[in-house]
Curated annotation (Swiss-Prot):
Functional pathway: Carbohydrate degradation; pentose phosphate pathway; D-ribose 5-phosphate from D-ribulose 5-phosphate (non-oxidative stage): step 1/1
Function: Catalyzes the reversible conversion of ribose-5-phosphate to ribulose 5-phosphate.
GO biological process, one term: pentose-phosphate shunt, non-oxidative branch
EC numbers on record: 5.3.1.6
Chain's gene name: rpiA
Keyword Isomerase: yes
Keyword Membrane found: no
Superkingdom of the organism of origin: Bacteria
GO cellular component: cytosol
Organism: Leptothrix cholodnii (strain ATCC 51168 / LMG 8142 / SP-6) (Leptothrix discophora (strain SP-6))
Name of the featured protein: Ribose-5-phosphate isomerase A
SUPFAM superfamilies, A to Z: D-ribose-5-phosphate isomerase (RpiA), lid domain, NagB/RpiA/CoA transferase-like
The protein's assembly and partners: Homodimer.
Residues bound to substrate: T28, G29, S30, T31, D81, G82, A83, D84, K94, G95, G96, G97, K121
Length: 220
């Protein structure tokens, strides 16, 4: 199966985790697009969606799925999103689509995070995929230097990208993230950092992993 076919497979499988009558949290990215397309088939059974990005909002609305403002929702039963990497404990690197801050906000509302990914995203230790960090523009160089000093990482500004919040993305390479929760906690305290793309506090409860043999369900 191709990577696109694996994404479609887990996108379809994730629909089973959406309770009838609920508001569902929707992430961002190519795998999530497959979930949105599958969600359209049951749009009459749900109350709507809360979206983590402008791109996802536009796709949801184009398919006739109501999108609610975050202020209208106190809790949601499930948040469905992809990952750039996921480790054996359900910790993730996210933010390849530059929507990490809003993704983390929506994930914080959810009772359960269901990650959808193809098998290539499963790793033993995170850090091979560049770690995205949303930063206030004036702090980009300062935060980049700090990554080098603290972790030996090389941080570069992602060219041509401005987040939905008007900020920049640093992509940090050369990391070995043995303790995701500790790194997430520390980096989020650095001045100028809006959000780091480590999801350890908001880790996955379930991962639907697309494999050539079908969907593999990992519970954390």
């Amino acid at each position: 199966m191709t990577q696109d076919e694996l994404k479609a497979l887990v996108g379809q499988a994730a629909v089973a985790y959406v309770p009838d009558g609920s508001v569902v949290g929707v992430g961002t990215g190519s795998t999530v697009n497959c979930f949105i397309d599958a969600l359209a088939a049951i749009k009459d059974r749900i109350a709507g969606a809360v979206s983590s990005s402008v791109r996802s909002t536009e796709r949801l609305q184009a398919l006739g799925i109501p999108v609610l403002d975050l202020s209208q929702v106190e809790r949601i039963p499930v948040y469905i999103d992809g990952a750039d990497e996921i480790d054996p404990r359900g910790h993730m690197i996210k933010g390849g689509g530059a929507a990490l801050t809003r993704e983390k906000i929506v994930a914080d509302l959810a009772e359960r995070f269901v990650c959808i990914a193809d098998a290539s995203k499963r790793v033993d230790v995170m850090g091979r995929f560049p770690l995205p960090v949303e930063v206030i523009p004036m702090a980009a160089a300062q935060v980049a230097r700090r990554f080098g000093a603290a972790y030996g990482g090389l941080a570069r500004v992602r060219e041509g990208v401005v987040t939905d919040n008007g900020n920049l993305i640093l992509d940090v390479t050369g990391l070995h993230i043995a303790d995701p929760l500790a790194m997430e906690t520390e980096v989020n305290q650095w001045p100028g950092v809006v959000c780091v793309g480590i999801f350890a506090r908001h880790k996955a409860a379930v991962c639907l992993l697309g494999t050539p043999e079908g969907v593999r369900t990992l519970n954390f």
